[in-house]
């Protein structure tokens, strides 16, 4: 793992490279952002939204949490959604899950891990809802299928939020 000095050095090199390519880059970026997309994704460090989509700073509004959940009581996520919809007027919302999600796997394993257990209950609910389908599968396929079902459930949650219902009126 890189130390903080390496991160700071990398950031300085990144900034320098951008200014060399486009001297007004940061000045332009400070005036406004105009993303067309809101990305709700997993906190997993292997799923970097901008890098996966090839978008630059200002082009993608991002919210990340463990297992890309959209929960009706999560004021952080809902605030991001409302800001994206009402202020930034994004055109599309992407809920991006991924195979091999550690949050989904932890929910299946049902080991005590502390505070995160409360968060994982939402995935366990999906597990129980689809247990007859999932129970017959090999472990790896079970996790991947639960990752897919989780994304579908979060799309449902988002679509039934007051924010989206108001936006669609």
Where are the language model's segments positioned?
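Glycine/charged-rich beta-loop-alpha catalytic/anionic-binding loops adjacent to active sites
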Residues: 57-68
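Divalent-metal-activated hydrolytic enzyme cores
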Residues: 1-35, 67-91, 102-169
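Generic beta-strand structural signal
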Residues: 58, 91-93
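Short beta-strand segments
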Residues: 40-42, 64, 94-98
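N-terminal short beta-loop-beta anion/metal-coordinating cradle
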Residues: 18-59
